[in-house]
């Protein structure tokens, strides 16, 4: 951002090494080692949370989903699959009721920035194999940044990810961003959300503008209604292909 001053410049003086002289790499300390290598057909229901950009309200929406599902008596595991290490995001899901929680750092990546498609899918699949095997449970996943961000777009474009989605929650900072995001989701990824949330859901004006443009339900993640969340997260209805009001 041109309004933000340049970051502090540092000079690398050396590497941390083992007693044998090998450079320490976080990838050598992977904490996720699934016993299974092939996914069972019946799996935990994936609630995928994505949005227009950073600070659009994704983490709060993901936490609201964890809160609602855990209050309905379901066991929920939660993950953040793309982005840069931010422990508070997965801790907020744990605080909201998620049982097991983790992100890509558990696989040794401090960030998913510039990872190849194969490595991104490996991150997604290993977490899926580790914590989403039980069809009686839910798996809430947040994708960082916006849907056009490289690694997030990479996953949304892949059929292995899209076919896993049980419910898709789309977050936006404002109504206009949500409207544009809905079109991008439909045209680029062939996806239609089951609900809209994020910062815009806290504004009556934004909600009014959205409801005039789209028939997709909107839930306020800052003041979630359990009955409404139940209707959104447990409904067996397939996502409508007609997201926009005529």
Predicted features by range, described:
Residues 2-30, 83-84, 92, 117-133, ...:
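Conserved catalytic-core segment of NTP-binding enzymes
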Residues 29-84:
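Walker A (P-loop) phosphate-binding motif
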Residues 42-44, 74, 88, 96, ...:
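Short gly/pro-enriched beta-turn/loop segments at secondary-structure junctions
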Residues 59-63, 89-90, 152-153:
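A short secondary-structure junction signal
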Residues 241-246:
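Long, low-complexity, intrinsically disordered segments
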